[in-house]
Amino acid sequence: MTSAPRPCEFERTCSALASPELIRLITEIDDNGTIPPRGLARTLPDLSPHQLRHAAAQAHTLGLVRTRRGLSLTESGTQLAEVYDEAARWARAHDYPGVTNTFVTRVRATLQLLGSADVSVRRQERNGELGLVVSLEAIESLTGPKNAVESWIARHGGADPTATEAFEGARQAA
Protein backbone atom coordinates (compact mmCIF):
# COMPACT_ATOMS: atom_id res chain seq x y z
CA MET A 1 0.00 0.00 0.00
CA THR A 2 1.34 3.43 -0.90
CA SER A 3 1.26 6.39 1.42
CA ALA A 4 -0.61 9.60 0.69
CA PRO A 5 1.33 12.20 -1.29
CA ARG A 6 3.02 15.02 0.60
CA PRO A 7 0.85 18.17 0.76
CA CYS A 8 3.16 20.18 -1.51
CA GLU A 9 3.18 17.37 -4.10
CA PHE A 10 -0.61 17.13 -3.93
CA GLU A 11 -1.05 20.91 -4.34
CA ARG A 12 1.49 21.05 -7.18
CA THR A 13 -0.21 18.17 -8.99
CA CYS A 14 -3.68 19.70 -8.59
CA SER A 15 -2.34 22.96 -9.99
CA ALA A 16 -0.72 21.26 -12.99
CA LEU A 17 -3.78 19.14 -13.77
CA ALA A 18 -6.14 22.14 -13.54
CA SER A 19 -4.93 23.66 -16.81
CA PRO A 20 -8.08 24.28 -18.92
CA GLU A 21 -6.26 23.34 -22.13
CA LEU A 22 -5.03 20.08 -20.60
CA ILE A 23 -8.52 19.24 -19.32
CA ARG A 24 -9.95 19.85 -22.81
CA LEU A 25 -7.28 17.76 -24.52
CA ILE A 26 -7.50 14.77 -22.18
CA THR A 27 -11.30 14.67 -22.12
CA GLU A 28 -11.53 15.11 -25.91
CA ILE A 29 -9.29 12.11 -26.50
CA ASP A 30 -11.04 10.11 -23.77
CA ASP A 31 -14.49 10.85 -25.21
CA ASN A 32 -13.72 10.61 -28.93
CA GLY A 33 -10.55 8.58 -29.34
CA THR A 34 -7.23 9.30 -30.99
CA ILE A 35 -6.72 12.72 -32.56
CA PRO A 36 -5.25 12.20 -36.06
CA PRO A 37 -1.79 13.57 -36.87
CA ARG A 38 -1.98 17.33 -37.51
CA GLY A 39 -5.65 17.23 -36.44
CA LEU A 40 -5.37 18.97 -33.09
CA ALA A 41 -6.38 22.42 -34.39
CA ARG A 42 -9.42 20.95 -36.18
CA THR A 43 -10.42 18.98 -33.09
CA LEU A 44 -10.17 21.91 -30.67
CA PRO A 45 -10.74 24.92 -32.96
CA ASP A 46 -11.55 27.34 -30.13
CA LEU A 47 -8.04 27.02 -28.66
CA SER A 48 -5.21 29.19 -29.98
CA PRO A 49 -2.09 27.58 -31.48
CA HIS A 50 -0.19 28.58 -28.31
CA GLN A 51 -2.81 26.90 -26.09
CA LEU A 52 -2.71 23.76 -28.24
CA ARG A 53 1.09 23.59 -28.09
CA HIS A 54 1.03 24.17 -24.34
CA ALA A 55 -1.57 21.45 -23.73
CA ALA A 56 0.19 18.91 -25.95
CA ALA A 57 3.60 19.66 -24.41
CA GLN A 58 2.24 19.42 -20.87
CA ALA A 59 0.43 16.17 -21.68
CA HIS A 60 3.66 14.72 -23.13
CA THR A 61 5.75 15.86 -20.17
CA LEU A 62 3.31 14.33 -17.69
CA GLY A 63 3.18 11.08 -19.68
CA LEU A 64 -0.52 11.40 -20.46
CA VAL A 65 -0.40 11.01 -24.24
CA ARG A 66 1.57 9.18 -26.90
CA THR A 67 1.96 10.26 -30.51
CA ARG A 68 1.91 6.95 -32.29
CA ARG A 69 -0.50 7.32 -35.24
CA GLY A 70 -2.00 10.46 -33.78
CA LEU A 71 -2.46 11.69 -30.24
CA SER A 72 -3.85 9.03 -27.89
CA LEU A 73 -4.01 8.54 -24.13
CA THR A 74 -1.58 6.45 -22.15
CA GLU A 75 -2.84 4.46 -19.16
CA SER A 76 -1.98 7.48 -17.02
CA GLY A 77 -4.02 9.75 -19.31
CA THR A 78 -7.01 7.41 -19.23
CA GLN A 79 -6.90 7.31 -15.45
CA LEU A 80 -6.59 11.10 -15.33
CA ALA A 81 -9.77 11.34 -17.42
CA GLU A 82 -11.46 9.32 -14.66
CA VAL A 83 -10.12 11.80 -12.07
CA TYR A 84 -11.59 14.63 -14.15
CA ASP A 85 -14.94 12.82 -14.32
CA GLU A 86 -14.95 12.35 -10.53
CA ALA A 87 -14.14 16.03 -9.98
CA ALA A 88 -16.91 17.11 -12.37
CA ARG A 89 -19.46 14.81 -10.69
CA TRP A 90 -18.64 16.30 -7.29
CA ALA A 91 -18.88 19.86 -8.65
CA ARG A 92 -22.20 19.14 -10.36
CA ALA A 93 -23.65 17.58 -7.21
CA HIS A 94 -22.70 20.67 -5.18
CA ASP A 95 -23.37 23.33 -7.85
CA TYR A 96 -19.71 24.27 -7.66
CA PRO A 97 -18.52 26.75 -8.74
CA GLY A 98 -22.06 27.65 -9.83
CA VAL A 99 -25.30 26.16 -11.12
CA THR A 100 -24.47 26.56 -14.82
CA ASN A 101 -20.87 25.78 -15.69
CA THR A 102 -18.97 23.82 -18.27
CA PHE A 103 -17.22 20.53 -17.61
CA VAL A 104 -13.84 22.28 -17.79
CA THR A 105 -14.90 24.98 -15.31
CA ARG A 106 -16.18 22.36 -12.86
CA VAL A 107 -13.04 20.23 -13.06
CA ARG A 108 -10.72 23.23 -12.81
CA ALA A 109 -12.56 24.75 -9.84
CA THR A 110 -12.64 21.42 -7.99
CA LEU A 111 -8.91 20.81 -8.54
CA GLN A 112 -8.13 24.37 -7.43
CA LEU A 113 -10.22 23.82 -4.32
CA LEU A 114 -8.48 20.51 -3.60
CA GLY A 115 -5.10 22.13 -4.13
CA SER A 116 -5.76 24.94 -1.69
CA ALA A 117 -4.29 24.33 1.76
CA ASP A 118 -7.46 25.61 3.46
CA VAL A 119 -9.62 22.70 2.30
CA SER A 120 -8.15 20.36 4.88
CA VAL A 121 -9.73 22.48 7.61
CA ARG A 122 -13.19 21.16 8.47
CA ARG A 123 -15.15 24.39 8.29
CA GLN A 124 -16.95 26.49 5.76
CA GLU A 125 -14.36 27.90 3.40
CA ARG A 126 -14.06 30.67 0.88
CA ASN A 127 -12.06 29.70 -2.17
CA GLY A 128 -9.80 32.73 -2.52
CA GLU A 129 -9.19 32.75 -6.26
CA LEU A 130 -12.80 32.21 -7.22
CA GLY A 131 -14.34 33.91 -4.16
CA LEU A 132 -16.83 31.08 -3.64
CA VAL A 133 -18.18 29.81 -0.36
CA VAL A 134 -18.07 26.03 0.03
CA SER A 135 -20.34 24.40 2.60
CA LEU A 136 -19.06 22.06 5.29
CA GLU A 137 -21.09 19.23 3.71
CA ALA A 138 -19.46 19.85 0.33
CA ILE A 139 -15.97 19.95 1.84
CA GLU A 140 -16.59 16.69 3.69
CA SER A 141 -17.75 15.03 0.47
CA LEU A 142 -14.55 16.06 -1.34
CA THR A 143 -13.07 12.72 -0.31
CA GLY A 144 -14.10 11.16 -3.64
CA PRO A 145 -12.17 13.61 -5.84
CA LYS A 146 -9.33 13.84 -3.29
CA ASN A 147 -8.93 10.06 -3.20
CA ALA A 148 -9.02 9.94 -7.01
CA VAL A 149 -6.18 12.49 -7.26
CA GLU A 150 -4.17 10.74 -4.52
CA SER A 151 -4.61 7.40 -6.26
CA TRP A 152 -3.50 8.90 -9.58
CA ILE A 153 -0.41 10.41 -7.92
CA ALA A 154 0.41 7.08 -6.24
CA ARG A 155 0.22 5.24 -9.57
CA HIS A 156 1.85 7.81 -11.80
CA GLY A 157 4.07 9.94 -9.60
CA GLY A 158 2.24 13.25 -9.74
CA ALA A 159 3.53 16.31 -11.53
CA ASP A 160 7.27 16.83 -11.91
CA PRO A 161 8.09 20.08 -10.08
CA THR A 162 10.45 21.35 -12.78
CA ALA A 163 7.93 20.66 -15.54
CA THR A 164 5.15 22.33 -13.56
CA GLU A 165 7.29 25.41 -12.91
CA ALA A 166 8.30 25.62 -16.57
CA PHE A 167 4.68 25.43 -17.73
CA GLU A 168 3.53 28.03 -15.21
CA GLY A 169 6.33 30.35 -16.31
CA ALA A 170 5.41 29.90 -19.97
CA ARG A 171 1.74 30.48 -19.22
CA GLN A 172 2.44 33.71 -17.32
CA ALA A 173 4.73 34.95 -20.10
CA ALA A 174 2.00 34.44 -22.73
Task: Specify the residue positions occupied by each region the protein language model found.
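Short alpha-helical segments that sit at the start of domains
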Residues: 2-26
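Basic, amphipathic "hinge/linker" alpha-helix immediately C-terminal to the N-terminal HTH DNA-binding motif
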Residues: 67-90
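Amphipathic alpha-helical dimerization/coiled-coil segments
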Residues: 85-173
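Recognition helices and adjacent regulatory flanks at domain boundaries
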Residues: 1-6, 56, 68
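Short acidic, hydrophobic short linear motifs in intrinsically disordered regions
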Residues: 32-44
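Short amphipathic alpha-helical interaction segments
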Residues: 46-61
